[in-house]
Design a protein with these regions (language model features):
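Aromatic- and Gly/Pro-enriched helix-to-coil junctions and flexible linker segments
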Residues: 1-205
Length: 205
């Protein structure tokens, strides 16, 4: 089942077909998706994004087979406070800000250094909230935070524009800053990662 409780949450569907030889193939992009209940939508790549509270059903069809998955959505339209470890740091990584070619390099970039790929949350939170008199994370006026102004290229930024005002990533950072730019050290951390299918068939390289 799919149970999502925040507007920024989503679910990635993966459909695996078992072949005659015993190997597996990822057929997610070949599946026909339908959503009942008007609670969200599914992209051709199987990414489910919620749009309304309620219960529904996600149906996948492939090669004459059919599978239904119950869906329950809540929290749409309600305020939420993004978590630094779970929500903000992954966005910073996705945008490339803490990469080795940017602020995650040994000496940082333009006087601003982050831990490489966000491995040290305490170091990063201090870099965002303590340095430069907290100008990088302006809790009084989040939109004036250098963290957002640089990323959206509202002010000169050597790395160019990596997000836009109003975008999902921009809003996650803005809401986090507006809620006080805090770090919760008790946030659950990722313990392991699994790849599916485990024995894939590669048709082209």
């Amino acid at each position: 089942s799919i149970v999502l409780g925040r507007s920024i949450d989503y679910a990635q569907m993966i459909v695996t077909a078992k072949l005659e030889g015993g190997s597996e193939a990822d057929v997610t992009r070949m599946v026909e998706w339908t959503v009942q209940g008007e609670v969200g939508s599914v992209s051709p790549r199987g990414l489910f994004v919620p749009s309304a509270n309620g219960k529904g059903k996600l149906t996948a069809r492939f090669a004459g087979l059919r599978l239904e998955v119950p869906v329950e959505i809540s929290g749409i339209g309600s305020g939420y406070v993004p978590d630094f470890v779970r929500d903000v740091n992954p966005v910073v990584t996705k945008l490339g800000c803490n990469a080795g070619t940017c602020h995650g390099s040994k000496d940082g970039r333009e006087g601003f250094k982050l831990s490489l790929r966000g491995y040290d949350a305490i170091f990063d939170i201090r870099a965002f909230t303590d340095d430069m008199a907290s100008r990088r994370a302006n809790v009084a006026v989040p939109e004036k935070s250098l963290m957002l102004q640089k990323a959206s290229a509202s002010v000169p930024h050597e790395g160019g524009q990596v997000t836009k005002p109003g975008s999902k990533y921009y809003e996650i950072i803005r809401n986090w800053i507006g809620a006080g730019a805090k770090l919760d050290l008790k946030t659950a951390r990722v313990e392991s990662i699994e790849l599916f299918p485990k024995n894939p068939v590669v048709q082209e390289i």
